[in-house]
Amino acid sequence: MNWLTNVVRPKIRNILRRETPENLWIKCPDTGQLVFYKDVEQNQFVIPGSNYHMRMGAVARLRAIFDNETWYDVALPEVVADPLKFRDERKYADRIKDARTKTGAHDAVRVGFGKLETSPVVVAVQDFDFMGGSLGMAAGEAIIRGMELAVEKHAPFIMFAASGGARMQEGILSLMQMPRTTVAVQMLREAKLPYIVVLTNPTTGGVTASYAMLGDIHIAEPGALIGFAGARVIEQTIREKLPDGFQRAEYLKEHGMVDMVVHRHDLRPTLARLCRLLTKSPALTVTTAVEAPAEAAAKAEPEATTTEQPVAPAPTEPPAQPAAPQA
């Protein structure tokens, strides 16, 4: 009987049991309500009702920004994976391996080149799911390569920052990326190219002491945590209670640290408008002409109808194939 109850019956139950995905529902951190994950995903990871902005992966960011959800993944320089042979509770190499398996990304920063409302742009995205979006050698090289490509293509550079700071497992090599990325920003300025930074939740630590706060325009998502040190550390240092909302996007806007707070649904048109403004490109216009009856009849004839649409030239340098939309 033990064989029947302990072996056969559990196997039958496993066969008949309906599999339920672990991420079928998602809980809003603000209100606690349970929301269907697909609804949140289709809403650009904004909780319906509460408008709470969830963290957004690099691929989802790029899909939301580029025309037709298509872009070129920029080939990034290879770096030494574990230069210090660092180990705490686990080997750093094992942590990197797990993060790559979890996110499908090589490191915390992904760079894409494509069109934003028909204008070429270079976009770099930090993925907080990859070791907290920490800034290491690979991330620093990715950001610098993205800025170099922007100069080569004479295109605006857009940076989506989301990080807990420098990657401690790489020590001084990680901290060295702060001045290196700062020098790369100066390269954009000398080329007179727009550098727009989108500060997402959270943007803290060393990135706020380098490239994340050096943009021509700083945009923050609603409710984003932005700052160098944590609020508790500051309170213990100055021995004072911090005001409500300290280090949040809205507080920083009121005190002049960011230029605007933009809802995620409005981010793409806002970025496109800023790029056109800063590059002095003509605005997109939609015109409706009233045609004479004779002209309308002539255009109705198949042999007289011509449909000409501008064809964007294919990028010449960025490598590999266009990144296909990912579910």
From Swiss-Prot:
Catalytic activity, EC: 2.1.3.15
Annotated region described as Disordered, given as residue ranges: 293-327
Biased composition (Pro residues): 312-327
Entry's localization field: Cytoplasm
Pathway: Lipid metabolism; malonyl-CoA biosynthesis; malonyl-CoA from acetyl-CoA: step 1/1
UniProt-listed Pfam families: Carboxyl_trans (PF01039)
Biased composition (Low complexity): 293-311
UniProt-listed InterPro entries: AcCoA_carboxyl_beta, Acetyl_CoA_COase_Trfase_b_su, ClpP/crotonase-like_dom_sf, COA_CT_N
Function text: Component of the acetyl coenzyme A carboxylase (ACC) complex. Biotin carboxylase (BC) catalyzes the carboxylation of biotin on its carrier protein (BCCP) and then the CO(2) group is transferred by the transcarboxylase to acetyl-CoA to form malonyl-CoA.
Name of the protein: Acetyl-coenzyme A carboxylase carboxyl transferase subunit beta
Gene: accD
